[in-house]
């Protein structure tokens, strides 16, 4: 949301304070099917279930910051971004003094399914201190419009019309252009924190650059073409949407290892390796029980899958490609085994 704020401030800095007419949001760069946020795991309000969108903002999520005020007996709630047309409860009562923090989200008894209203029926334990709760907005299609209008008005801007979706006419000269972060920065955010929707955005962009239209079919075709040109004899992956948040995506451990070997020889190898979580240090591996700093590995976990893949830095000075994929109803129990495998590989003497 910082980038949207800076963009609107930049617009106002050019002397534009009043927009007569509408703000038109053009999200036609991506052509993706309708998305059911509850389909994967029945948790539609979890930000990780957000759908890819050419104008995705803040993962279609609202960050609610709760700040307890013991003297007033309540917690104040700050909302980011401020969504236009949404009633937001400003405070919630504090729980009885001495109440343990515990499951504070459940204690709040939030009502988040109404696109026009955010409400809480419960209480907030002061012992929790300041906490942030990020929840997906229930009407993803209107999120960008509400966020743009809400932030524009919060910055003091005026709008005589509305914010709506549409296609910008060809040939218009941009007032200014905002540049995205470098690809290495995007990949780092995807890999360090297993950001599924960002992975899908990047996947679709493969098709956009190659075909001028971003579809999942086009992205899969672009990946197959790349794979065939470089790893033709290895079994190609079968991605569904470009992310690990899938029950249908497939890749063999051998094929993934071949790809990692190829990547090690690439000129952009340093950027790829630095994007991977470091065992016991950061990202999704910060709590790993493996010896800290011995490996750069991407993790993957679903209810019946546990996996790691990447590079292990051994005591001998050698570098090993490591791929381990566990498919089992109790796959979560394999985490200590995978940690032990990483340590065993690192102790190669």
What is each model feature region?
Residues 193, 203-349:
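Small-residue-rich helix-loop
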Residues 1-234, 340, 347-348:
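Conserved serine DD-peptidase/penicillin-binding transpeptidase domain
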